[in-house]
Amino acid sequence: MALERTFSIVKPDAVAKNHIGAIYNRFETAGLKIVAAKMVHLSQEKAEGFYAEHSERPFFGALVSFMTSGPVMVTVLEGENAVLKNREIMGATNPADALAGTLRADYADSIDENAVHGSDAVESAAREIAYFFADEELCSRTR
C-alpha cells in the first residue's frame, strides 16, 4: 500500500446544507487524515481554471456557475491509497447510481449538484492540490 495525498472539494450544495462535518467524519473514519483545509468562494476565473479540461463540454458553463454559487471547502486528504479510498467514499458521480452509504448517495441531489469532488489519480491530485494550496499550507500528520 502507498501513502498518498488526494484532493477533495465539498461543493456549494453540501456546504449550504451544513454537511461539512459529516463528510469530514466519513473521511476520518475511513482512515484518511485532513492535512489542509480551507473555505473559499471560487471566482469565475478560479473555477474556470480548475475545470479547464471540461471547457469544451456542454455542461461547462453550468458547472462553473454552480461552483461559484456559494463557498466550498477545499481539502487535502492523506492516507493509504487515498485517491481510491476517497473515490470509494464519494460513490458514483451520479447519486442515482451511487451505492448506499456513500457521500453522494447520502448528500447529493443530482448529477449536477453532487456534493463532492475528488481527484481521479495521484497525478491529478498533485495538480489540484497545488492549484489551491502552497506547500507550507500542507501539515504533516505524524501523530
Swiss-Prot record:
Top-tier EC class: transferase
InterPro entries: NDK-like_dom, NDK-like_dom_sf, Nucleoside_diP_kinase, Nucleoside_diP_kinase_AS
EC number(s) per entry: 2.7.4.6
Assembly: Homotetramer.
Catalytic activities: a 2'-deoxyribonucleoside 5'-diphosphate + ATP = a 2'-deoxyribonucleoside 5'-triphosphate + ADP; a ribonucleoside 5'-diphosphate + ATP = a ribonucleoside 5'-triphosphate + ADP
Similarity annotation: Belongs to the NDK family.
PROSITE patterns (UniProt xref): NDPK (PS00469), NDPK_LIKE (PS51374)
Record's function text: Major role in the synthesis of nucleoside triphosphates other than ATP. The ATP gamma phosphate is transferred to the NDP beta phosphate via a ping-pong mechanism, using a phosphorylated active-site intermediate.
GO molecular function, one term: metal ion binding
GO biological process: CTP biosynthetic process; GTP biosynthetic process; UTP biosynthetic process
Record: active site: H117 (pros-phosphohistidine intermediate)
Keyword Cytoplasm: yes
Localization per Swiss-Prot or TrEMBL: Cytoplasm
Signal peptide: none
GO CC, any one term: cytoplasm
Protein name: Nucleoside diphosphate kinase
PANTHER family linked: NUCLEOSIDE DIPHOSPHATE KINASE (PTHR11349)
List of residues binding ATP: K11, F59, R87, T93, R104, N114
